[in-house]
């Protein structure tokens, strides 16, 4: 399984003056790390281990003596099974259907061993062409076992997977997805294609070229087939088919370089229809969200295509799903959407996205808290009204500020981004709210950080806050935020930062010092804000409309 490196590279360097678009930070491949498909059942490649219950309408009669012969083989040690593979190959190439089927089952069982299945030894037997031949017979039980064996070979390493792909199995799998055969056979073919798609980008593109996506999409339909009565067994089989189809589609949508969007985006209407259905297995919702996260990872045109599908309200709702295998990819997808234009971000906000993302800040898993901060930082890089939504949520601001002093370093950095962005292009009310939540003290504490990114983010935030205070100064003669920073011993730290080796840091420090030197904060008491009995700063009545309590 591949994993995203946990680095902190950014597509866009921090800039002194951030507008609502440049402040948004697109995720690079190595940027923010949430482990995709961490559970064994959702690996990029999977092997069938547990025997499902295939249809009994195509029974193959195996005489007792043949059953006994193959049962004896099954009871052998692995070493003896490998030694006796030539005999199993002979049986597979027999003209006797009972021998062919029984040997096929034994090959499948060998390949389904949980640890270290003998994939290479089976490949060396040269049976893959025979498996492809059996895959095209008109007995679904034989097709099923053949597809299962090929699926497990394709679950191996790159060379083993390529052996299946190069043998000509792919067109047969795709043909069977569209054929009149059982759901079990289709499920196994979809599973095999998912293993191949998860191998390499070239393999993924090969499947897309052969029309795998177009063959898979119709199988996402969750209705009754041909008006037949739906039984519990039928429903369970349909769920199994859909689960594997969704997983395979998610593998077809993932990877860098990204697949042809015009091809993979065709699944969006079907995803929108399926994701709205209640009480499906968590794995289905999880893979649907992963597929969406891949589809909206990129230019705003891709984000808009996902939005236009109508899926966003349900996607945001899944942020409150109780299982992490769902809310993890849902957060990834929502996080990608809010990297878009302000109008695209607004769709998430309008569906209670800020509140639901805020709840995830309390999740124990570090990567979820980090991703949540990252998503909020892109929302606070938006319009003033969007910043107001974040800042006016007491839980959001309180938690973000708490993370500045009580979290791991990389989470602290993301929280810094979210809060610093909220000081830029924001309303007077939002700045006042942040100051009331003691953001100045936390920013000043971070001025001692050895992380250059944090230093620059914090200094930018302080500059934005002080610039807001200049509006007050025009009315009262005093910039209240300059005073507060000075009283918190922030001024001396900022002075020292003028000697910093980083050009960006000392330039920002110098800009801040200019505000201190131009402020007459050491004048008489009349030029200072009064302190009321609650220890709050008050300003003259002519500043009533913008008064603040700190």
Curated annotation (Swiss-Prot):
It is found in: Cytoplasm; Nucleus envelope. It holds the Pfam family Arm. GO terms for cellular component: cytoplasm; nuclear envelope; nucleus. ARM repeats lie at residues 116-155, 158-198, 201-241, 256-297, 300-339, 342-381, 385-424, 428-467. It comes from the Eukaryota. One of its GO terms (molecular function) is nuclear import signal receptor activity. Residues 1-30 have a biased composition (Basic and acidic residues). Keywords: Cytoplasm, Nucleus, Protein transport, Repeat, Transport. InterPro entries: ARM-like (IPR011989), ARM-type_fold (IPR016024), Arm_3 (IPR032413), Armadillo (IPR000225), Importin-a_IBB (IPR002652), Importin-a_IBB_sf (IPR036975), Importin_alpha (IPR024931). Residues 1-34 are annotated as: Disordered. Residues 1-56 form the IBB domain. One of its GO terms (biological process) is NLS-bearing protein import into nucleus. Belongs to the importin alpha family. The N-terminal hydrophilic region contains the importin beta binding domain (IBB domain), which is sufficient for binding importin beta and essential for nuclear protein import. Forms a complex with tnpo/importin subunit beta. Functions in nuclear protein import via a substrate-importin alpha-beta transport complex that passes though the nuclear pore complexes (NPC). Binds specifically and directly to substrates containing either a simple or bipartite NLS motif. This is Probable importin subunit alpha-A. It comes from Dictyostelium discoideum (Social amoeba).
């Amino acid at each position: 399984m591949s994993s995203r490196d946990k680095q902190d590279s950014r597509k866009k360097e921090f800039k002194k003056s951030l507008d609502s678009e440049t402040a948004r930070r697109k995720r690079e491949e190595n940027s923010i790390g949430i482990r995709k498909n961490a559970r064994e059942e959702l690996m990029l490649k999977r092997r069938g281990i547990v025997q499902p219950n295939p249809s009994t309408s195509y029974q193959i009669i195996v005489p007792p003596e043949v059953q006994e012969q193959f049962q004896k083989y099954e009871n052998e040690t692995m070493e003896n099974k490998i030694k006796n593979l030539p005999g199993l190959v002979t049986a597979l190439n027999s003209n006797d259907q009972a021998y062919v089927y029984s040997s096929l089952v034994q090959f499948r069982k060998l390949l389904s061993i949980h640890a270290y299945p003998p994939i290479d030894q089976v490949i060396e037997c040269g049976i893959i062409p025979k498996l492809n031949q059996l895959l095209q017979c008109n007995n679904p039980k034989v097709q099923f076992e053949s597809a299962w064996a090929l699926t497990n070979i394709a679950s191996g390493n790159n060379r083993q997977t390529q052996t299946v792909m190069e043998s000509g199995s792919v067109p047969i799998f795709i043909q069977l997805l569209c054929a009149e055969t059982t759901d079990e056979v289709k499920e196994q073919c979809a599973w095999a294609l998912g293993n191949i798609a998860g191998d390499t980008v070239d393999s993924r593109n090969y499947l897309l070229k052969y029309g795998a996506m177009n063959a898979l999409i119709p199988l996402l339909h969750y209705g009754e087939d041909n008006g037949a009565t739906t039984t519990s067994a039928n429903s369970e089989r349909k769920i199994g088919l859909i689960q594997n189809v969704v997983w395979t589609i998610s593998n077809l949508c993932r990877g860098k370089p990204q697949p042809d969007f015009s091809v993979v985006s065709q699944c969006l209407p079907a995803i929108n229809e399926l994701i709205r259905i209640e009480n499906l297995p968590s794995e289905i919702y999880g893979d649907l969200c992963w597929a969406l996260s891949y589809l909206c990872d990129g230019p705003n045109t891709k984000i808009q295509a996902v939005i236009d599908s109508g899926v966003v309200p349900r996607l945001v709702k899944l942020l409150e799903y109780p299982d992490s295998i769902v809310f993890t990819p849902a957060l990834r997808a929502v996080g990608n959407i809010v990297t878009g234009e302000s109008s695209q971000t607004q769709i998430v906000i309008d569906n209670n996205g800020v509140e639901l993302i805020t709840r995830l800040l309390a999740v124990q898993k570090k990567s979820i808290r980090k991703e949540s901060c990252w998503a909020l930082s892109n929302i606070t890089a938006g319009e003033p009204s969007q910043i107001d939504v974040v800042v006016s949520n007491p839980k959001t601001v309180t938690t973000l500020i708490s993370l500045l002093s009580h979290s791991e370093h990389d989470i602290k950095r993301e929280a810094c981004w979210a809060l610093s962005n909220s000081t830029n292009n924001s309303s007077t009310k939002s700045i006042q709210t942040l100051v009331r939540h003691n953001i100045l003290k936390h920013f000043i504490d971070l001025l001692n950080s050895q992380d250059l990114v944090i230093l620059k983010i914090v200094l930018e935030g302080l500059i934005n806050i002080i610039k807001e205070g200049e509006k007050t100064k025009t009315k009262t003669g005093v910039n209240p935020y300059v005073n507060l920073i000075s009283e918190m011993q922030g001024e001396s730290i900022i002075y020292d930062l003028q000697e910093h080796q980083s050009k960006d840091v000392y330039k920002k420090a110098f800009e801040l010092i200019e505000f201190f030197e131009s402020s007459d904060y050491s004048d008489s008491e009349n030029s200072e804000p009064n302190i009321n009995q609650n220890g709050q700063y008050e300003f003259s009545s002519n500043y009533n409309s913008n008064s603040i309590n700190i």
